[in-house]
Amino acid sequence: LNTFHFNSLAILLMAGISCHTTADSYGIFDARSLALGGTGVALGNVDTGHFYNPALTAFHQGHEDRTRDGSHSFHAVLSALSDGARTAADAIADDLEGRLSAAIDDLNEVPTPGAARTGINAARDLENAMRQLDGKDVNADGYLGYSISLPGDMEGGAFFVGSRFIGRGVSDIDNADFDLLQDYVEALEFVESGGTAGEEHPELRDDAGRFIDPSFRIQSSAAGTGLLLSELGVSAAKQYNLWGQDVAVGIAPKVVHLRVFDEDWRVVDGEFASIGDNRTEFYFNVDLGTAVTLADHWRVALAVKDLRSKTITTDIGDRIELQPRSRLGLAYISESLDVGLDAELDKTPDLQGTAARQDISLGTEYRLSTLALRLGFRHDLEGSVGDQFSAGLGWRFSHLLMDFSYIQGDGGEGVGLRLGWAY
């Protein structure tokens, strides 16, 4: 039997963006910001602030050789994984179609009641998984990278390299496939019972009397696009005193390698085939940011991510647009307690221009001697995604730095991890 079809469909749904996708977001690139609901434009610190506002690394006093505030950090963040994506991942891990294929092969070799029962169970499990996927949004957004923070005396910078993956989709399961699997269940029940239950369904057998591969008749399909954004860059920031206030400006030039997966998966002559293309683009982009500290504890910040827009038209006619995203941040920062609010200034259209998103994020952090406690909330003003609540811990022991976070909301969840070394 052809075991490629359903697993490939599930994999595509894990990595696809269909015509009904939700909008692209500003992005979450580290575990601390994930725990704070995505807040970071004003509330970011010298370790990871460059991801959200390159000006933030300038808010530091003393050279890193004396303060030991610089760090090497490895980041692994899955900021969004929908329930549909979990269902697809479980289906891939369980290899449901492979189980059905093996059961049918065994039955064709030795047609015993036990082999028929194994095939019945496999067909029902596959049907249940397809029903769970039918019409569900399948969304995933994650980041994997490495960074070095270089805080100086009223100035700073960072080096960063990493990849962000964005994938969204909606399955298109044909109802005829459910009928097909039910026919196989009835035919296998007929074999198991010796003809006293089920139905014979001779149309499911070839001229030699062997069961035909059901994958040749499956009609379900999926079409979509996935993005892999890989960046290598540096950030630089400088702090100035203007009219008695500390003002910082920063810039983060970067080289971007963009890979677009644009495919249309469907059955062609009995095989699950892809009609589409994978494209790559290599270009330069830049992030800009500024921040000002007021009355010692208040900070107002503005940042623009990916100043240069990018438009790609794929071979199957989809127009993908990556536009600049701007955010305003407000934070209260003290010795032990930080509270921050981020708001996107514009609606951000999705990659195919069919929906929009505009996030506001609220986060708070309370620091003890070696432990940081974090809570966050994220809301989309356009309603394209549901509200999310998050929490996390930060821990420092000597030079070792660790951050853990978890986020959950309407229809999905995410996790984040950072491992760092202070120097």
Predicted regions and their residues:
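Cleavable N-terminal export/targeting peptides
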Residues: 1-30, 107, 112-116, 191, ...
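N-terminal, post-signal peptide beta-strand-biased segments of exported outer-membrane/organellar beta-barrel
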Residues: 19-172, 421-423
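Transmembrane beta-barrel architecture of outer-membrane proteins
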Residues: 31, 139-143, 229-233, 281-285, ...
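Transmembrane beta-barrel domains of outer membrane proteins
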Residues: 55-58, 145-151, 160, 233-239, ...
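Short loop/turn motifs that connect adjacent beta-strands in outer-membrane beta-barrel proteins
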Residues: 58-72, 148-156, 239-248, 260, ...
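Extracellular/periplasm-exposed beta-strand and loop segments of Gram-negative cell-envelope proteins
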Residues: 89, 122-138, 167-227, 256-284, ...
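Short acidic/polar capping segments at secondary-structure boundaries
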Residues: 164, 241, 253-260, 295, ...
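Outer membrane beta-barrel transmembrane domains
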Residues: 291, 297-423
